[in-house]
UniProtKB/Swiss-Prot annotation:
Function field: Involved in endocytosis and intracellular vesicle trafficking, both during interphase and at the end of mitosis. Required for efficient progress through mitosis and cytokinesis. Required for normal formation of the cleavage furrow at the end of mitosis. Plays a role in endocytosis via clathrin-coated pits, but also clathrin-independent, actin-dependent fluid-phase endocytosis. Plays a role in macropinocytosis. Promotes internalization of TNFR. Promotes degradation of EGFR after EGF signaling. Stimulates the GTPase activity of DNM1. Promotes DNM1 oligomerization.
Protein modification: Ubiquitinated by ITCH.
Key words, A-Z: Acetylation, Cell cycle, Cell division, Cell membrane, Cell projection, Cytoplasm, Cytoplasmic vesicle, Endocytosis, Golgi apparatus, Lipid-binding, Membrane, Mitosis, Phosphoprotein, Protein transport, SH3 domain, Transport, Ubl conjugation
One Pfam match: PX
Species for this entry: Homo sapiens (Human)
Name assigned to this protein: Sorting nexin-9
Bias type Polar residues, positions: 111-121, 135-145, 191-201
Region annotation (Disordered) ranges: 91-201
UniProt binding sites for a 1,2-diacyl-sn-glycero-3-phospho-(1D-myo-inositol-4,5-bisphosphate): R286, K288, R327
Phosphoserine: residues bearing it: S116, S121, S197, S200
Protein family (similarity comment): Belongs to the sorting nexin family.
N6-acetyllysine: residues bearing it: K288
Length: 595
């Protein structure tokens, strides 16, 4: 009898990931409980099949009755975890932000149905972005042989972090940036990743905001901005506003993953060696350190720069060789992205992450980063464009143009991911089997011919046999080929999917600031602000616009380089693949003489 399971939490599938949308209380049939990576395959009453997080369902008894059981739930431990105090706090936070959950996993839902009018109109941008916030982890076992295709499909939910913080790591966030703010505005979307509450119950990630972002008025209406020590200049180049790039660039090599343990072996983890190419001096970091860096970058720069989430960690089977290889590959890609960004790579927190000399220096730098006041919208106070102020109409047009392009690109990237996933499944499943069937059929025919006893057909029978073996070889080539070309195309698209998922929140911050400026006339009329305050607001929104344009120019230059490189590689490998097949077929053909 097929195993049944009751869905414990709502789960919204992402396009292109072979996932199945399920709702709390729904009964599904488990068709494959051993997918791996914290996933199982299920079928709903409509006959639709797809992946569902293991911890989102409860296995029902064999009689099919839905009764409470402490012994058969896949998520028993998750249920017990929910009783912890940390979960109680997270649940309280989730309840207070419940209005932001309804938009699901599509960060562009508010863009498609945007409101107009008052200041709250852009609140819909609070949908969880896939890249910097609600995007589920991008990392799972690199199980190439699975029927579900490319490993990016297994974007499992964040699991309980058994790689707990050491005692030397601060508990509560010390930065004032994490304090609740009643002035959270359109830019106050909860961009934080589930890692902020990774020790709590494994429920839908978008129920836990990572932080509460102060409203843009903190920046726009500040009477006098302090002169920060750090400056982020913006210049006007051939293609418009741009960040100032350092004279020498560097990359960071992530290598040598090693398994470590603590507490007499009760806790285990993977540690990576990071070597910046500009110093060639290595430092070691565990995954939780990467997680800390991601959070600090998101908090500090997330209002202006897209910070894609890390490949998430996994608990079950996380030390499998293929999984470690895949996660290291994606950590490498993430670090390379950060190194290539002229603002991120030069930031104090990033440099400290790569160049600390000892434990004391690491702890000091860590605490300093967590107390950084120039975070969120206040990052714009450090930016100095070398250009005249823009008028509000132009600012709004630039913002709309960025929103439209990133939304359209997000759709295009998801479509390519979906098509690529389907193609991967065909290449690793049905297609090789068809070639194998042809090969076996030809060899069977040759065996039948050989049984005739006729002396003059030996050459023909041998040729048919070799042709059959050729098709079996082609089957193997077809099954292996996606790892040589499609994999890299999928990974590139997956990276950009993460980037694009950050933009609704960034655009929301800018749209909110624009709305504030539009309201300034009323505030001046009612003597709530002065005319000078209004002029300061316009100037500061202009700075925000220059920052957005500079970031988009950086984004476009990287996009052109990346897609040119990855599609060129894909086509080169495809040409080589078909040439190899053609050569094998020519060799098989040469055994058949013209008669």
């Amino acid at each position: 009898m097929a195993t049944k399971a009751r869905v414990m939490y709502d789960f919204a599938a992402e396009p292109g990931n072979n996932e199945l949308t399920v709702n709390e209380g729904e009964i599904i049939t488990i068709t494959n409980p051993d997918v791996g990576g914290g996933w199982l395959e299920g079928r709903n009453i409509k006959g639709e099949r797809g992946l569902v997080p293991t911890d989102y369902v409860e296995i029902l008894p064999s009689d099919g009755k839905d009764q409470f059981s402490c012994g058969n739930s896949v998520a028993d431990q998750a249920f017990l975890d929910s009783l912890s105090a940390s979960t109680a706090q997270a649940s309280s936070s989730a309840a207070s932000n419940n209005h932001q959950v309804g938009s699901g996993n599509d960060p562009w839902s508010a863009w498609s149905a945007s409101k107009s009018g008052n200041w709250e109109s852009s609140e819909g941008w609070g949908a969880q972005p896939e890249g910097a916030g609600a995007q589920r982890n991008t990392n799972t076992p690199n199980n190439w042989d699975t029927a579900f295709g490319h490993p990016q499909a297994y974007q499992g939910p964040a699991t309980g972090d058994d790689d707990d913080w050491d005692e030397d790591w601060d508990g509560p966030k010390s930065s004032s940036y994490f304090k609740d703010s009643e002035s959270a505005d359109a830019g106050g979307a909860q961009r934080g990743n589930s890692r902020a509450s990774s020790s709590s119950m494994k429920i839908p990630l978008n129920k836990f905001p990572g932080f509460a972002k102060p409203g843009t008025e903190q920046y726009l209406l500040a009477k006098q901005l302090a002169k920060p020590k750090e400056k982020i200049p913006i210049i006007v180049g051939d293609y418009g506003p741009m960040w100032v790039y350092p004279t020498s660039t560097f990359d960071c090599v992530v290598a040598d993953p090693r398994k470590g343990s603590k507490m007499y072996g009760l806790k285990s983890y993977i540690e990576y060696q990071l070597t910046p190419t500009n110093t060639n001096r290595s430092v070691n970091h565990r995954y939780k350190h990467f997680d800390w860096l991601y959070e600090r970058l998101l908090v500090k720069f997330g209002s202006a720069i897209p910070i894609p989430s890390l490949p998430d960690k996994q608990v079950t089977g996380r030390f499998e060789e293929e999984f470690i290889k895949m996660r290291m590959e994606r950590l490498q890609a993430w670090m390379t992205r950060m190194c290539r960004h002229p603002v991120i790579s030069e930031s104090e927190v990033f440099q400290q992450f790569l160049n600390f000399r000892d434990e004391k220096e690491w702890k000091t730098g860590k605490r300093k980063a967590e107390r950084d006041e120039l975070a969120g919208v206040m990052i714009f106070s450090t930016m100095e464009p070398e250009a005249p102020d823009l008028d509000l109409v132009e600012i709004e047009q630039k913002c709309e143009a960025v929103g439209k392009f990133t939304k359209a690109m997000d759709d295009g990237v998801k479509e390519l991911l979906t098509v690529g996933q389907e193609h991967w499944k065909r290449c690793t499943g049905p297609l090789p089997k068809e070639y194998q069937k042809i090969g076996k059929a030809l060899q069977s025919l040759a065996t039948v011919f050989s049984s005739s006893g006729y002396q003059g057909e030996t050459d023909l029978n041998d040729a048919i046999t070799e042709a059959g073996k050729t098709y079996e070889e082609i089957a193997s080539l077809v099954a292996e080929q996606p790892k040589k070309d499609l994999h890299f195309l999928m990974e590139c698209n997956h990276e950009y999917k993460g980037f694009l998922g950050c933009f609704p929140d960034i655009i929301g911050t800018h749209k909110g600031a624009i709305e504030k400026v539009k309201e300034s006339d009323k505030l001046v009329a009612t003597s709530k602000i002065t005319l000078q305050d209004k002029q300061n607001m316009v100037k500061r929104v202009s700075i925000m616009s220059y920052a957005l344009q500079a970031e988009m120019n950086h984004f476009h230059s990287n996009r052109i380089y990346d897609y040119n490189s990855v599609i060129r590689l894909y086509l080169e490998q495809q040409v080589q693949f078909y040439e190899t097949i053609a050569e094998k077929l020519r060799q098989a053909l040469s055994r058949f003489p013209v008669m």
